[in-house]
């Protein structure tokens, strides 16, 4: 069965030629950080908002180096306290379909810590789908060889974040696997229920950036406990906080060491007054140390 690209034509272009050109243009503006990037944190808003930022993540995916891409994204539409896997064989994009690695999803399910998503749950969620066109574009010459492992991450306790980190760490250590963590950063404004503004000496948009960059610095430290404390203290509305935390626990349980770096940051708009709103997009990479 196929997961249809339900957000094409609204969140991003559904015309293959135009979409490919758009992605190519954005990728040409970005610069690769390192040949050894093993994981990225990339945004998942509509491409008119975050498409350019995502290029700074995906320029670091070298498809020739990998056989499968794990994608961890938050669940926006269904409340779940666990992680969900897809039963579908293929996920569609306008520029080429991506096959699911069923052997891997079955092995993950057999751990007893995952559930199966329904087709409608898969198709309603945008955080995973918004990563697919970029993967398909970057891997356009290897679409038949590359597979994906989409994982929908629910609202996890710290203990479960750690558990999933331990489960997934051996997969991260496998040199054939690349990990994508899907997350936007601060959602600021009354419509998001978040209007924290403590440093009145700077404009609101600058305060938001300070807040986000503090979070990104903690992610760079690789400490999931400190990241949890930061979220508890600031209540920053990072929608992919659980996938990010799982990724930090993965690196904690990895047999290798990783350098975590911030690559790019922007906001959908500059908040000047309290009635304004914005969403932030931060891009980070996890690079294996030699």
Swiss-Prot record:
InterPro entries: MEMO1_fam (IPR002737). Residues 12-39 form a coiled coil. The keyword Coiled coil applies. Keywords: Coiled coil. The keyword Coiled coil applies. Pfam families: Memo. Gene3D superfamilies: LigB-like. Belongs to the MEMO1 family. NCBIfam families: AmmeMemoSam_B. PANTHER family: PROTEIN MEMO1. This is Protein MEMO1 homolog. It comes from Dictyostelium discoideum.
